[in-house]
Curated annotation (Swiss-Prot):
Record text on subunit structure and interactions: Forms a complex composed of sart-3, terminal uridylyltransferase usip-1 and U6 snRNA; complex formation is mediated by usip-1 and sart-3 binding to U6 snRNA.
Cofactor: Mg(2+); Mn(2+)
Protein origin, superkingdom: Eukaryota
Cofactor: binding details: Binds 1 divalent cation per subunit.
GO MF terms, alphabetically ordered: metal ion binding; RNA uridylyltransferase activity
Organism annotation: Caenorhabditis elegans
Summary of the tissues where the protein is detected: Ubiquitously expressed.
Protein name (record): U6 snRNA-specific terminal uridylyltransferase
GO CC terms: nucleoplasm
Entry-linked SUPFAM superfamilies: Nucleotidyltransferase, PAP/OAS1 substrate-binding domain
Major subcellular location class: nucleus
Annotated Mg(2+) binding sites: 183, 185
Protein function: Acts as a specific terminal uridylyltransferase for U6 snRNA. Responsible for the addition of UTP at the 3' end of U6 snRNA which stabilizes U6 snRNA. Does not have activity towards modified uridine containing 3'-monophosphorylation or 2'-O-methylation.
Amino acid sequence: MSSNLQLVETFDSRQFVVARWNRNDTTAMVPSAIAVVVFVESVEYKLGCKEKIGYSPTPEDQDQFMILQMESIDEANRICHDSIAKGFAINNTKIVFTPLLGLNGFRLQDAIDFMKTSQPHFNNDELLEVLTMAICQELPERLKILEDGFSFIEQGVSELIQNSACEMFGSFASPVRRNGYSDIDINVESVSAPGQRVSTNVRPLNEVVANPKCLITHPLTKSELETYPQEEIIKILYRCFNENSAFKTKFEMRFLPARTPIIVFKNIEVEGMNVSYDLSVHNQISVEKASLLHEFIVKDKSKGSRMKNAMMFIVHWAKSNKLLSGDYPEEKLEVKTKLNSYIINQLVIHFVQAATNKVHVNPQAKRDSRVNEYNFDTLFGDYCKFFRELFKYYANFDFTNKAIYGKKAMQKKTLSSAHGGVEESPLMLMDPMDITHNISAKVTEDAVKLLNGLIRNALFILKQNHFHINYLLETNTMATMLMKSREPKISISTRVTDGAEHQYLSVQLPAVVITSSDLFLLLTRVLRFNVCPNEQGPSVVDLCTPTGAIFLVTSRAWVGRRNTKRALKNSRHDLTPLQIDVMCSDKYDYEEDIAELRISMSTVPGTRIRLACIDIMRGQVSEVRDAIHFLIDQFINNNYDDLEKNGVQTISRIPIAAPTWP
């Protein structure tokens, strides 16, 4: 562990505050970060270590922020309180101070900005661990309220159910899954002491439903708890709690009908604190599901439990990119995706088994024996490689037709018929602890489209030569920015040749394109450029001469590929992603002439930078630019690992797609 990482591990985030202001708040001079620091000190607030001040890395952005360490926790609380009570402004620009560690842990935007100020000091593995350390921090007062609330509910349950036992499960109860915003899941059972006589009498359910208050004098017995339907028990308990003035003072309560019905207790004692408890009865299956996730993490024998950090990061990634709701009001999704952290975690577990071609999880085994030991470092090496492989796997996953079933991916129709007509859905993921239950049945089609887009953009980020892993917290924004930053590699100029005005494209080629043979193969096989029939020759070597070779563009092989690729995937399960991409181009027929191009290749003197010079003799610049963007930013980028390992010429060994194939 680096010395910087050790400092982060020991720092108390309660001393830190976030200052925010907007450049559009005033027509006067917008305050700089230094001006904000001077202002804070001028009104006699005591700063801590000034070296730990984090500035917005983009001072030209509309929204500005700073992260400041105050001298003490009390001083941090004081400036945040005064920011609301008094209000601060510089040159009429309002400055707002909030705690870095809020009532419900780190805010999503604060975590993003905290990582921006941290990225110069850490490598990517360390950055990810900085984030997981941060989001695991929680306020002691929140913890106390959680524990007091649990004890209060536990006492209330004991008055309504004989020999009741309230068991915590889920992320809060797991040392390796708990974070600063975990809520509490509670399962209620009736447990008899050894030798204790248990009544087998069961009252008619309708009697108890008609008079729930009878439980105050005659609590539910173990036999009744195991006999009555779960939903009816939960409804009865809900009515009892909802008529209890002590509970109504402490909690906002609601009954939630679902496959596993629950009562949700939301603590209302502290304004703004999002603390809730989900209470279910006789729900051992959910306890075992949570136990499986816990065991999957603890069976990782890598140093520092890297799988724990990876899974915590991927859930936070989903929240930051609006696949899941956050824990503050402004972080709630306007349109629910119906995804949840359990589904996200199960997607990771499936990937690990599929990628290693090994069954790591045996759900039917006994607790603590359901997961085989493994080592994250041995399987994946580092976090970036893990996420690159994860997103690459799902970028090539056929969500339309395939379902996830443990280690396997199989046809939805096959799985549905094999398990008694399990409902098909846009995302179909079977619960490893209950193979008849599609846990993603309610996930919307729009959510799957959003997930798919995020996966592809995340993969694009991870394939860059230089990036920070926290870019993934703003996946679509950062991917768009990176794509735009690559555009200057294609420069356009106008020249007069033989009395005619020609437009030229100069293209910096990716490192995997080494020889003129490589470029020729990509142009003719992937883009379907056709050597001009009037051209004498040319041999491949001609691309390295100033005159190069002339090509006719007679099909738009870079447009509308998705359906063709999907059809190839479904008909040929033996094909690799590279083979599918190349064969997809084979399906394009020659059409009318779109453009005529003279293309040559050269190397920048004294460097390894290789350029393609494209003289547009006839045709639209936009068409040619789109074709080259597809070749470099999609085809080569998506298949970079294969092309780097095996060389571009491996494409020549891929059979041409037969006309009869889809």
